[in-house]
């Protein structure tokens, strides 16, 4: 009898966790398309402060922290970025000790080292190889890890050409990540990561002055999410201006 009650209790907890996880994903997506980073931070901090988190929820939290850190660096809010990099690393250490989805864990380590470079470019020669190594190890563990391909793309995108960086090579990695993401149509529905990847592709095509492709991807994004503020109000008008001229 006690075992039956225990099983039912665990099932209820898991069901509640799944529902909360789904709600968090939707709320983060809505914050992303509206550029509501205050709302994003509120969701992220609430999850961080939960006493008990499953491995799945903890990995999702790292994803939200990853997105927020990138925004902080873009806004030159270095102290905030450093704070959340530290939190994300602690969360990854827990996941690594639990031997949970190590391919994703390594891909996030690669991303965090990339952020370290963004905060201090002079550290690039020392940190850059670590970022690359983690991304490569992530792919060794799982060739189907789209996020690891995205990180390989980021490494190529931000690495100076004198050190081997290439925007065209970055595009190749981004497109590979896109193919892998799109294999599971359900997971990319209302997924900020998918829109973010498509936006990176727009930016990369713009950088190599392939405005036709950049325009096409802007229109793909707006078809998926017409209310995506960053594309609708900023990138698409900029791309159209370049395309027409």
Model-derived regions: residue spans:
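N-terminal signal peptide c-region/cleavage motif recognized by signal peptidases
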Residues: 17-19
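TPR/TPR-like alpha-solenoid helical repeat scaffolds
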Residues: 187-203, 229-245
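Amphipathic alpha-helical repeat scaffolds of TPR domains
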Residues: 23-27, 52-74, 100-119, 144-161, ...
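Flexible helix-coil transition and linker loops at the boundaries of alpha-helical arrays
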Residues: 46-60, 91-105, 136-145, 178-191
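The canonical alpha-helical register within tetratricopeptide repeats
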Residues: 46, 87, 94, 130, ...
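Bacterial N-terminal signal peptides that target proteins for export
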Residues: 1-8
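Short coil/turn connectors between adjacent alpha-helices in alpha-solenoid helical repeat scaffolds
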Residues: 28-35, 70-83, 115-128, 158-171, ...
